[in-house]
Amino acid sequence: QYLSHDGIDFYHRYKEDLKLFKEMGFNCFRTSIAWGRIFPDGDEELPNEAGLKFYDDLIDEIIRNGMEPVITLSHYETPLHLLCEYGGWISPKMITFWHRYITTVFNRYKGKVKYWLTFNEVNAMLRNPMIAAGVLHIDDPQYKDDAKKSITPKDVWTAYRNILIANADTVYTGHQIDAENRIGAMMTASGTATYPENCDPD
């Protein structure tokens, strides 16, 4: 049955995991902050302190184990309420909600986190807008059996435009809060991994 086990259970076992990574000699550790843990519905005025406390502890533990935290701000987890209420990134209101989230996080971890990724595989939404950008007409009765079919090319490009505006705002805001921040988006390849024939760079 789906979700019948705990997977790696990182939420409860991250201290053990980070000790193992330290033993392996890692000098950085990439993880994600779930937007919905900080703003459960996504459009609240005030953040969820319990959610922030988890990331306080996680980031401190990464640093304690001698690793540089590399934080992804969005990794395919747009809060469900934003999808249901606004259609996800189709709505320009998402830019305002996103700004509140990233400002909260940048201020909270100023001086602790230097390396930031805005959107994981930001260009993946062109192929899979529902997963990558939370784009869905979830309440459209015409598509009750397959809501993904309701997504039009215009929806996709509108959402992508809003995400790119939010991405630019993230870079600007992050540098305003801490000029030492290094911020960029993660890109995905064409969908097919390719590897060289051998390790010779020529």
Task: Report each predicted region and the residues it spans.
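Active-site gating/metal-coordination segments in enzymes
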Residues: 33-37
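Non-catalytic scaffold segments within catalytic domains of secreted glycoside hydrolases
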Residues: 1-14, 18, 22-27, 39-202
